[in-house]
Amino acid sequence: MDPRGTKRGAEKTEVAEPRNKLPRPAPSLPTDPALYSGPFPFYRRPSELGCFSLDAQRQYHGDARALRYYSPPPTNGPGPNFDLRDGYPDRYQPRDEEVQERLDHLLCWLLEHRGRLEGGPGWLAEAIVTWRGHLTKLLTTPYERQEGWQLAASRFQGTLYLSEVETPNARAQRLARPPLLRELMYMGYKFEQYMCADKPGSSPDPSGEVNTNVAFCSVLRSRLGSHPLLFSGEVDCTDPQAPSTQPPTCYVELKTSKEMHSPGQWRSFYRHKLLKWWAQSFLPGVPNVVAGFRNPDGFVSSLKTFPTMKMFEYVRNDRDGWNPSVCMNFCAAFLSFAQSTVVQDDPRLVHLFSWEPGGPVTVSVHQDAPYAFLPIWYVEAMTQDLPSPPKTPSPK
């Protein structure tokens, strides 16, 4: 959807100015695309380990109750005529972006399933746990020219946890978000309401409230190079008519974008927006992005499907385009950098990785507040020597 300012907001936390810094030499990691143009690294086909839902009050449920079903308009009928402004602001309940959720919902799922993880309990000790949105930012970093980021990292029982921190600049932009941008964010969610049904075979109901607290999240296992990954990401809907109903290949990502009317506009779209769409969908193995193109009045009159594995073809011959190998190689390099930097096993010790466009990734070290992000309830529960439930069969 376009833009997703709040959607991944669940994965951020706001902090004050750095304090409690611990003296330590600060290594760095360059981000120049030319340094990462080697062959595409190994990336294990993502497999879904489970899922969870967040309800209208943002409460966690370890099930698929919030999953919606892809229900596009008939291809043989009149084209769509979706009014993306309908219901704004009267039927809009946006999530409170001041609430610092960090990794908490994913950690709830981990606590529920720690004894039944594919690969056994030893696998988690070697893994990196994070949100899909954080990995997406890493993938796009070599080509990003505007927005920096900060990632807090802590090691606990061997596992490396990564949680995004809202930068001061990002916070300032969010608090000063102009009305037009707030409306554009609503329009992206409204598009989902036009394209999704609550039950298989039923029709969408765009007359209801748009509540961005509600979310369905997939939890996935993968591996990039030598780095086992356990990450979660929000899923827009599942396609009951997909060739395979096995997650994540049945999932569909929904986006909106303004109509394009010139080759230059399309070229810019392929270079910038399509890169982010590719990174967001490639990581969890979502095969298709369905885009609704809106006119200046906020109506969607055309849809286009972008297969994730074919997105690179739009920029393959563009010297100013992006390269998937560069994205994945940089991400792998960052994960190696983080693994070798965060050595001490201490949930209250935080290495803060910071990056601004044009520079390298730098590191600072902090103890406890404001950067520590692993909650006490999670640390205590994982520390207790409780018997593990029986394993469930490993998903293929």
Curated annotation (Swiss-Prot):
One of its GO terms (biological process) is nuclear-transcribed mRNA catabolic process. Its EC number is 3.6.1.-, 3.1.13.-. The modification Phosphothreonine is found at residue 392. Transmembrane segments: none annotated. Binds 2 magnesium ions. One of its GO terms (cellular component) is nucleoplasm. Keywords: Exonuclease, Hydrolase, Magnesium, Metal-binding, Nuclease, Nucleotide-binding, Nucleus, Phosphoprotein, RNA-binding. This is Decapping and exoribonuclease protein. One of its GO terms (molecular function) is nucleotide binding. Mg(2+) 1 binds at residues 192, 236, 253-254. It is an enzyme of class 3 (hydrolase). Mg(2+) 2 binds at residues 192, 234, 236. The modification Phosphoserine is found at residue 394. It catalyses: a 5'-end triphospho-ribonucleoside in mRNA + H2O = a 5'-end phospho-ribonucleoside in mRNA + diphosphate + H(+); a 5'-end NAD(+)-phospho-ribonucleoside in mRNA + H2O = a 5'-end phospho-ribonucleoside in mRNA + NAD(+) + H(+); a 5'-end NAD(+)-phospho-ribonucleoside in snoRNA + H2O = a 5'-end phospho-ribonucleoside in snoRNA + NAD(+) + H(+); a 5'-end (N(7)-methyl 5'-triphosphoguanosine)-ribonucleoside-ribonucleotide in mRNA + H2O = a (N(7)-methyl 5'-triphosphoguanosine)-nucleoside + a 5'-end phospho-ribonucleoside in mRNA + H(+). Belongs to the DXO/Dom3Z family. Its cofactor is Mg(2+). Decapping enzyme for NAD-capped RNAs: specifically hydrolyzes the nicotinamide adenine dinucleotide (NAD) cap from a subset of RNAs by removing the entire NAD moiety from the 5'-end of an NAD-capped RNA. The NAD-cap is present at the 5'-end of some RNAs and snoRNAs. In contrast to the canonical 5'-end N7 methylguanosine (m7G) cap, the NAD cap promotes mRNA decay. Preferentially acts on NAD-capped transcripts in response to environmental stress. Ubiquitously expressed. Substrate binds at residues 58, 101, 131-133, 217, 234, 255, 280. Residues 1-37 are annotated as: Disordered. It holds the Pfam family RAI1. It is found in: Nucleus. Residues 1-20 have a biased composition (Basic and acidic residues).
